Amino acid sequence: MGTQKEKKSVFALLKSNSIGGILLMLATALALIMANSPGHYLYSMLITTPVEVRFGPLEIAKPLLLWINDGLMAGFFFLVGLELKREIFEGGLSQRSNIILPAIGALGGMVVPSCIYLAFNYQDPVALRGWAIPAATDIAFALGILSLLGSRVPTSLKILLTTLAIFDDIGAILIIACFYTNDIYLPGLLIALLCMLILFIVNRCKVERTTVYIFIGSIMWIAMLKSGVHATLAGVILAMFIPMYSRKHPGQSPLKNLEHDLQGTATFIILPIFAFANSGINLTNISMDFFTHAVPMGIALGLFIGKPLGIISFLWVGVQLRLTKLPVDLNWSTVTGMSALAGIGFTMSLFVGSLAFDQAITGLIFDERLGIIMGSLFSGLLGYLLLNKTLPGDKHEM
């Protein structure tokens, strides 16, 4: 499975994503330590620090946490959009034969976890807002675990996990756009649409300076922030207008250059900061009722059981119907281990959770982050153990 060009594009991301996964673990551990230390109030003060930006009459005032979730994550989704466009033009999504297998797996990996969550929470209208939380996959974390197995991991398995996560990202983008949009403020939406039109015109005029696109995209981000449509979507939309190829410099790609420049920033700065700001749960006053509440239980079981069950069952049906087939060097045992790793929702699940629930309101009843961390932790452990047992080569001792 996969051409040489496709393998090269995947390996270009593997090293940074693997290290990024380790950084995410460290950022999460640091947040939990700070949130449960005698100086836990310093952590709370930090993420709730008010930050205000003014441009003449325009004012944007938010706590630091929301600047991270709405601002920094827009940069992350911009990178996701760039990766999607590149994959569509010349990567793993450019050939139909390479699309069907991960697309079917990703569909199952979103549908079944969501159904498990709904089975726990269908009677609670507030809890229902979290149905999409276990549908996400954190590719950086998953690749970080996969990297622990070294050269034993076949290339086709890395490509399958990466492309499956790409489809997961597409699903997350659509879910955010359709289900987590607040009341619409029409003037803001119209300005955002005008920015999209200008971006289209600039692209058609063959403008290659990425700073022009980013300037217009920044205005679009502000407009979407005010419009009620989640501002992170501005990053994805902006990426679609970045030129793939350069007419002035044949062989150069403005999109690839920008993607290369942003990869390290997203992996080593944006995602660790997001994880640190969103995973600091104070466990000192949490009772067992918080762990057994239907929301965290639905999330944890959706990630731990629903993800691998959904991916494997949908892939099996797809293979039986001859819609697709497994790569020759993979078997159902290794694919099961990979499917368990896909249950590491972490940063993406935390992000969807921040859209679904307001901790100031629901925090006294349940904390969805408990389910995300538990489900992701057990999924990572299960995936590692399964792959360590089924992959050829020397087995790693725990």
From Swiss-Prot:
GO terms for molecular function: sodium:proton antiporter activity. It is a multi-pass membrane protein. It comes from the Bacteria. One of its GO terms (biological process) is regulation of pH. It catalyses: Na(+)(in) + 2 H(+)(out) = Na(+)(out) + 2 H(+)(in). Its main location: membrane. It is found in: Cell inner membrane. One of its GO terms (cellular component) is plasma membrane. The chain crosses the membrane at residues 19-39, 64-84, 99-119, 130-150, 159-179, 182-202, 222-242, 266-286, 299-319, 337-357, 370-390. Belongs to the NhaA Na(+)/H(+) (TC 2.A.33) antiporter family. PANTHER family: NA(+)_H(+) ANTIPORTER NHAA, SODIUM ION/PROTON ANTIPORTER NHAA-RELATED. This is Na(+)/H(+) antiporter NhaA. It comes from Desulfotalea psychrophila (strain LSv54 / DSM 12343). The gene is nhaA.
